Amino acid sequence: MKKFLVLLTPALIAGNIVYAAELDLSREALEKATGISLGYNTSWTSHYVWRGESQSSKDMSPAIGADLGHSSGLYTGVWTGAITNSTIPSEFDWYFGYATDFGPISIDIGDLYYFYPGETDETQFNEYYLSLGTEIPLGMVAEDFSISPYVYLAYAPKWYGANTPDVFYTEAGVEASIPGTPFSLSYTFGNIDVDDLEGDAEKANTVDSWNYYYISFGFGEVLGLDTSVTYHNAPGYKGDAGQDGFFISLGHEW
């Protein structure tokens, strides 16, 4: 599966650029008639890091996804990417939710399901999330300068099966455009709070809470691909999967 994704992703990136105009026309007609919008995305990263934890053993990870939305604010989507910590080296995510604006505040609430083919049912889990964000123009600094802060809260009950901990995720970040350029800077800080396991001290000691942070520099579009480089770190994480480092990300949406 990983080889398939590695071979498929460059073809999807090239193909979506060639046919983007034609697809946009079809989707525009669909959205006008029904309020339904379709979106697709493909990406490649030199290292898949999830909340400070390596999912690809520092190997590259291609990914593809699709989104279906409605003018009411309801949406659903799927995503799959290559990982190395599963019997079948792929992760499949399915999510649905509701997004709207309340004045200047963007609100997003939903459910994200993580599925790992070949693993037991206990490995699969749900994450219920709430995201709040806004954009703050700073015209007194520069005409095209703004910052975009956000907060992301999530709860995953029984993280990996019965008699395993509940997990709370807290994440906050901010992105700032660099005036007069296509570049941007962003900073993210998060915490994974793992509850102690009830009645199982041995398992309780195998998982710890940890903090993580990312510092990213975005280059804007380079040859039609959104390009960025990120430094990541997970202070307090026990294990090699939390080692710090850099990764490069390429992506395209159509």
Locate each region found by the language model.
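Outer-membrane beta-barrel "beta-signal"
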Residues: 219-223, 241-254
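Short glycine/proline- and aromatic-enriched beta-strand/turn motifs that initiate or cap beta-hairpins
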Residues: 21-84
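Residues that define the transmembrane beta-barrel architecture of outer-membrane proteins
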Residues: 34-36, 58-62, 88-92, 105, ...
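Transmembrane beta-strands of outer-membrane beta-barrel pores
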Residues: 44-50, 80-84, 100-102, 113-117, ...
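Transmembrane beta-strands of outer-membrane beta-barrel proteins
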Residues: 38-42, 64, 74-76, 94, ...
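Short loop/turn motifs that connect adjacent beta-strands in outer-membrane beta-barrel proteins
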Residues: 21-37, 73, 101-106, 118-121, ...
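Glycine- and aromatic-enriched membrane insertion/assembly motifs of diderm outer-membrane
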Residues: 57-113, 219
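Detector for outer-membrane/organellar transmembrane beta-barrel domains
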Residues: 125-205
